[in-house]
Amino acid sequence: MKIVLANPRGFCAGVDRAISIVERALELYEAPIYVRHEVVHNRFVVEGLKQRGAIFVEELHEVPDDNIVIFSAHGVSQAVRKEAKERALTVFDATCPLVTKVHMEVARASKKNIEVVLIGHAGHPEVEGTMGQYASDSAGMYLVETPDDVIKLNVKDPSNLHYVSQTTLSVDETADVIDELRRVFPDIQGPRKDDICYATQNRQDAVRDMASQVDVMIVVGSKNSSNSNRLRELSEKLGTTSYLIDCPEDLKEEWLTDQAKVGVTAGASAPEELVNQIIEQVKAFGGTAVEELTGREENMFFEVPKELQIKTVS
């Protein structure tokens, strides 16, 4: 049984930056360091940071006074920022810069009293943070997930409308929603550049290229990872039986029985160390040669905050 590796796969620049922020804060300021929400949606990463002294909370009231708090890569609402400022908490912001770009689009529209439609999944922390950038009382912001949601949308002024999207969605499904928005609201405006992040796009393209070459697809990622779920869904849509797994123990031997080729990819929050562990498990179930496909080269890099760039405390 041949193992075929997607390329690119795994960590993106935003995830790298977010994890580095927590690691450097622990190095410079020592434990405990509080993190609002899982810094990235990967159980392996979160457990590793917990062992080093990071404490993950869902709300700021769980952070004691006079402590450091890190905002996760998914971003937070303006209300959360205001609360942190009022409590004089020391904040390091691990929000992905590509999410921040969407936040700025929403904030600009809000100041101009332009209504905004966000394409995204209800309940996802990125969506909650993005919705929380809108402050206009005279206009409104709306969340849609499917073309059917667009049909039901009742906006105040169809001629004064802008759309943005969650950064980790399915490229194809988002395009379908945008097409419906433009059909129903011909005057709607959108971002100059697609909000779907480069890493989400590249990993979906890699799965698209690989799905027809393998008999079964293993996607490495946590159940709460939006971009990992989209990879599994895309592979299934392309006709390849696919599974999302969090760790080597999740892999079932019967999935690989009588399969000639197994594809392996990973969501943007899954580390290569975990991918390697899962490859070893595939080998234990009969995997032999490993082939890594060629793919789009990624050289994106995001700096950590300057306060965390020093190596030692002076």
Curated annotation (Swiss-Prot):
Keyword Magnesium carried by entry: no
Annotated catalysed reactions: isopentenyl diphosphate + 2 oxidized [2Fe-2S]-[ferredoxin] + H2O = (2E)-4-hydroxy-3-methylbut-2-enyl diphosphate + 2 reduced [2Fe-2S]-[ferredoxin] + 2 H(+); dimethylallyl diphosphate + 2 oxidized [2Fe-2S]-[ferredoxin] + H2O = (2E)-4-hydroxy-3-methylbut-2-enyl diphosphate + 2 reduced [2Fe-2S]-[ferredoxin] + 2 H(+)
A Gene Ontology biological process term: isopentenyl diphosphate biosynthetic process, methylerythritol 4-phosphate pathway
E.C. number: 1.17.7.4
Gene Ontology terms for molecular function: 4 iron, 4 sulfur cluster binding; 4-hydroxy-3-methylbut-2-enyl diphosphate reductase activity; metal ion binding
Active site residues per record: 126 (proton donor)
Keywords attached to this entry: 4Fe-4S, Iron, Iron-sulfur, Isoprene biosynthesis, Metal-binding, Oxidoreductase
Secretion signal, residue range per the UniProt entry: none
Positions of dimethylallyl diphosphate binding: 41, 74, 124, 225-227, 269
Physiological role: Catalyzes the conversion of 1-hydroxy-2-methyl-2-(E)-butenyl 4-diphosphate (HMBPP) into a mixture of isopentenyl diphosphate (IPP) and dimethylallyl diphosphate (DMAPP). Acts in the terminal step of the DOXP/MEP pathway for isoprenoid precursor biosynthesis.
Name of protein: 4-hydroxy-3-methylbut-2-enyl diphosphate reductase
Gene: ispH
